[in-house]
Amino acid sequence: MGILVILVDLQCCRCDAKIRKVLGCLEEEYCIEKVEYDVKNNRVIVRGKFDPEKLCKKIWCKAGKIIKEILIVDVWPPPLPQPPPPCKPPPCEKPPEDCKPKPCHCCSCEKPKPKPKPCHCEKPKPCHCEKPKPCEKPPPCKPEEPPKPPPEKPPPKPECKLVPYPYPVPYPYAGQWCCPKPEPPKPPPEPPKEPEPPKPCGCSHAFVCVCKPAPPPPPPCGCSGGHGNCGCGIRPWPPQVWPPPPVCPPPPWCYTEDNANACSIM
C-alpha cells in the first residue's frame, strides 16, 4: 500500500481546484483508494494500491507548478516519538550510609531552568505622532489616445512647362504679313478693236460709196467694261482675291489661373 503526502497551498482556490482535478483524473488509472485534504496544514494525503514513484512522477508532470513537495511515506500519520526511559541511579555497592546517588546527566533529569523575572521597566509612553494620512487615490487611468494620422501633404503646385513649338522662319512680327506679298492685279484686257472700214468698191465716189448700204454698227454690250454676263465674247475680269489672314505666333508662356499676387516668386 502506497502513501503520498503532497504539500500544496490549499488556501489558494486555483491550486486547490487544480490538485483535485489532477487526482480525479488519475484515480482509476493508479487505483487511488482514498484522498484526504488537510487544509490547515496544506497537505494532501493519497492512499491506494499503486507504485508511489510512478504516481509521484505523474503528479509532478501534471501539476508541477503548484506543488511544493511530495513525500513518500510508509505510515501516516507518523508515530509519535517514544519518551526516553526514566533515569535510574546505578546500584550502590558500598554501604547505604556512604552511598550517595550520583547526579544524572540525562536530558529528562536536568533541573528546569528558572523562569525569567518580570521586567520592572517603565511602560512605553504612547506615541504623540500624527496619524499617517490615508494614501491618495491614484488618478483614473486615461484611455490611450489612438495615434493621430500623419498630416496630409499639400498637393503640389502646378508647374509651368514650356512646350516646344515650331516657330516660322523668319519670325513673324505684328503688323506685317506672314506670307509673301500678293501679286498686283492684272490690268483689264483691252477693249476689242473696231472693225476696219470696208474697202472702196471701185466706183467714182471718192469718200462714201453709195452703191451698197453700210452695215449697221454693233449694238452696245452694256457691260460697263467688266464683261461679266455680257455676250460680247470678251472674258470677264478675274475676281479679286484677298490676302490670307496672318499667322499668329503661339504665346511664349503658358497661362495658369493661380493668383500671381499670392507668391513673391510668381
From Swiss-Prot:
Gene3D superfamilies: 3.30.70.100
The UniProt record lists the keyword Metal-binding: yes
Superkingdom in the source lineage: Eukaryota
Gene Ontology process terms (BP): defense response to fungus; regulation of defense response to fungus
Traits of the deletion mutant: The pi21 allele confers an improved non-race-specific blast resistance toward Magnaporthe oryzae. Reduced salicylic acid (SA) responses (e.g. WRKY45 expression) but increased systemic acquired response (SAR, e.g. PR1b and PBZ1 accumulation), jasmonic acid (JA, e.g. JAmyb expression) and abscisic acid (ABA, e.g. SalT expression) responses in response to M.oryzae spores.
Induction of its expression: By Magnaporthe oryzae.
UniProt domain HMA: residue ranges: 1-68
Binding site for a metal cation: C12, C15
Purpose: Involved in defense responses. Contributes to slowing defense responses toward Magnaporthe oryzae.
Name the UniProt record assigns to this protein: Protein PYRICULARIA ORYZAE RESISTANCE 21
